[in-house]
């Protein structure tokens, strides 16, 4: 049994990095983060400016290339956000006591990376497909409004593709959300492997036994 005074010699001194920023700064950062996320999701619902510059001589290959470029841009933005989150944590650590991702990373780190990058690839293909369908549907809608015959339709003035565009925009926004969350989780669990990656039960019980 120890006396009323505790030995504080082993307690590390608080550094300047441990001090939380002022409340106004934290609120401002949260508002800016929400504005950024809202702006990113807005791109899923607002047509891109190049749509207005399209002519009726564009080929399907041009649409595919443009969709791939747009998807790369969206992917790069979320990748940069996830990497910035990783830099702020240094090194990234998961705070869950039981985490399947951490167990997979420790047991088979190569499979952890391959599995996540496979998810990234599938999300990228899904985002490119969503952008491509939106572009083609918007383009055909504009052709129908101008009275130009669309392949596979008999009445060009009565065909409207808005019923296809709106669901695809919601799907695109959901893909953006999945991509952002996957990058965050990947960087959070992809830290360097160490022996004491997680506290053992013996260490926890030894801490509880001290009175």
From Swiss-Prot:
It is a multi-pass membrane protein. It holds the Pfam family DUF4668. The chain crosses the membrane at residues 34-54, 59-79, 117-137, 163-183. Residues 1-33, 80-116, 184-211 are cytoplasmic. Keywords: Endoplasmic reticulum, Membrane, Transmembrane, Transmembrane helix. The keyword Transmembrane helix applies. GO terms for cellular component: cell periphery; endoplasmic reticulum; endoplasmic reticulum membrane. Its main location: endoplasmic reticulum. Residues 55-58, 138-162 are lumenal. InterPro entries: DUF4668 (IPR031427). It is found in: Endoplasmic reticulum membrane. This is Uncharacterized membrane protein YPR071W. The lineage of its organism: Eukaryota, Fungi, Dikarya, Ascomycota, Saccharomycotina.
